[in-house]
Amino acid sequence: MTNRFTELVLDCHDPERLAAFWCAVLDFEVIDRGEGKVEIGSWQPTVEEVRARQMPPTIVFIRVPEGKTVKNRLHLDVSPIDASTEDEAARLLALGATRVDVGQGPGRSWVVMADPEGNEFDVVRSLAPSAQRLPADCS
């Protein structure tokens, strides 16, 4: 028997606010709403597609009464595709993220941030084409 990773579920106080933040971060869309719940994704899942192949999971934000009290045991890493890591961190700050010190130390190639409800995530290496890269045959 095989399973598929279909959803990542985040408990939160304000599903609408976090869904809007993460839609802006990941260029996702809201694909479902319900009482105290918002689901976002890069695609509209169907049973047939999920059965046929592994598809990217959606993210579901569910309203809970309690707040976050400790560092996450699981976090997301995001890789910018059209900006440097620092430029993307600046964009995310403008969207409502904050920089977080979790003991990572100075001089790291990634930036630790938190979403508007304090859930940590990392902005890691940029996947943007670099004008400074040399072709493979150059030395």
Where are these regions (language model features)?
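Short linear motifs in intrinsically disordered
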Residues: 27-31, 81, 98-104
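Core segments of cupin and vicinal oxygen chelate
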Residues: 9-56, 94
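Vicinal oxygen chelate
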Residues: 2-3, 5-13, 39-41, 45-50, 53, 57, 64-89, ...
